[in-house]
Amino acid sequence: MTISPSKPKSSDVKQDKSAPLSTEELYQINAYWRACNYLALGMIYLQDNPLLKQPLKPGHIKNRLLGHWGSSPGLSFIYVHLNRLIKKYDLDVIYIAGPGHGAPGILGPTYLEGTYSEVYPDKSEDEEGMLKFFKQFSFPGGIGSHCTPETPGSIHEGGELGYSLSHAYGAAFDNPDLIVTAVIGDGEAETGPLATAWHSNKFINPIRDGAVLPILHLNGYKIANPTILARISHEELEDLFKGYGYTPYFVEGHDPAQVHQLMAATLETVILEIKKIQTEARTSGVAKRPRWPMIVLRTPKGWTAPAEIDGHKLEGFWRSHQVPITDVATNPDHLKILEQWMKSYKPEELFDEHGSLIPELKELAPIGHRRISANPVANGGILRKELRLSDFRNNAVEVSKPGAVEVENTKPLGNFLRDIMRNNMTNFRIFGPDETASNRLSAVYEVSEKTWLADILPEDADGSELSTDGRVMEMLSEHNLFGWLEGYLLSGRHGLFHSYEAFAHIVDSMFNQHAKWLEISKNEVAWRSPISSENILLSSTVWRQDNNGFSHQDPGFIDLVTNKSANVTRIYLPPDANCLLSVADHCLRSTNYVNVIVADKQKHLQFLSIEEAIAHCTKGIGIWDWASNDHHGQEPDLPDVIMASCGDVVTMEALAATAILRDEFPDLKVRFINVVDLYKLQPDTEHPHGLSDWDFDSLFTTDKPVIFNFHGYPWLIHKLAYRRTNHENIHVRGYKEKGSINTPLELAINNQVDRFNLVIDVIDRVPKLGSAAVYVRERMKKEIINNRNYAHKHGIDQPEILNWKWPY
């Protein structure tokens, strides 16, 4: 059975029969929109003759035509109508364009309201500036084809689809006066992240937060396909959004004059409804979940384009998605059609002889920071305030002797985060997918509970930690949480995202996009102020997935991070709780980075006092004298072997192996090196944290065997250190996809990061140990067998493993 689209009911839009726009207002708004559409076409097509003062010629056309027309008219249409209400009600509004490929529809208004020329003075508001504005678009040495960081007013590029709505809600949190207009493309609405982001309305508090106004831009088509939501019945579409908890308003049509009136009436209705919801909540002091309004805007794809080209439908069809007419430079008939199309906007009525927007239209835009493109929220670093951080040392673990006391590594961090939240109750939040308690961060609940505006039941009082004004954000969607965090950071605040290590891969692409945004912002957009770093804590790590097994074992997120620019990425693997505190304090103070911290939540041995941890983490890499017996490298006592580690569980196993070696071979000189800052392994020519060759060689020598026990996939160490002098002698152990429901030691044995295999590795690479080493090697093999058999029989490791302490 086929469900056909149906017409909207008359009750869907309560129109003002007198029409909200006067004849003059309608003319002016439409004229402003015509100017936006003219600029959009100019960006796609023109490299000369910007005002069409001459007949259009092939030489005026760019040699390579790039860009997307289809969404641009709808995006600028919304922008123009928002401007009207910003001026009327003095609104604080930012605009997120989900279909960011329709950037011409956003760039045009930013240029017309003057912001673009303010941040890029060479793109002046005259004919010369307009030409530069046109030519730079999707052009080498210019700007990209999306709402990139170079776009004033943008916090969302919209290149990869799916994140506009979560970014919008993130920006609205703790911004009570802000309205975030999130325009969602109907193609984007088919993505998983966007589909779940509709539920964000269960987490917005009308007292302390701003509002999000979702506008579904239903133009019917993607690149070459219809969209699902455009091909279901009106009733089904309406029920969908009612089911999500919204009140949907429909604005539909083709005729610009009619749709202008509908949009003006509807947008004013929903803005007043938002204000009413907020006023009632703030007056009563009671935060309830209202039915927030949203708009479904159904207009043609490529609106105002020619109806057809060569008998093929253009306006209102997928052919208008990108460059609508591709051969204008070589086809005279098509060139004429383009010229007629551009002239249909009557640029001579919109711009004066110098190429400036005429004053009557200029007055339609807001002024100063009320301009969408100049709103400081969209340049969040301007508004960013430093976190008020307590002394993390107050939460330190007492370590009087290395490797003697056990602590859950992330629990002291939870105490530190609790103190941070207490001191920053309007600009700091924690984001995690139902894992705050699991990752041992539940101390934060002493200060603030989980945000929750859906129903709360009586039994929730028994440990559920739910509150309408909580600051801990939990939802079982890594996509949505990460989007919230990014929106929160980009609008000037601070946050931490934590996740089970294996499932950080769910947001691989989101991390990619944010890293790219930071790279451009830092290096190419001087007017963007630094924002707080994106801090990611990966816990419940590969080596201690006691309840879950193989599916939860994947340390590869950090491999992905190393593919991104050294300017914006940092990776830390603290070996114990005090190092984790030091690293977290550093990361939370930083700006314009993605900081990834890998730290397990289970009980582990503690190695460094807080002062030792600070010194070690400040260096990022170093020799642990207390674990070494190479007499500080003094001649002729250079080490026979270097035992290196990076990560918490593998550090303990490397230390246990070192203890065995020192017991079995008292004359063997072992140097123990621990790495916290993974990028120390790269040369300083490749990463600003990298060691110089001299420093690296002084630690790892130029010719001695190095046994490197690594938390993640072993080839990552080779990737980072391949240019080092001693690389051929670096032997790396790490996770090799050998896992199940294992005991901790059994999992280590399966992947050869255990103490016994490490001892064998040393024996195999230090010839001076002689024939006596053969017997030790055999005992190590026997230990591997015995410990595996014990685990299979008893389900736990042997007592001497569970109770092992550093013996020296």
Swiss-Prot record:
Its EC number is 4.1.2.-. This is Probable phosphoketolase 1. It comes from Nostoc sp. (strain PCC 7120 / SAG 25.82 / UTEX 2576). Pfam families: XFP, XFP_C, XFP_N. It is an enzyme of class 4 (lyase). PROSITE patterns: PHOSPHOKETOLASE_1, PHOSPHOKETOLASE_2. It comes from the Bacteria. Keywords: Lyase, Thiamine pyrophosphate.
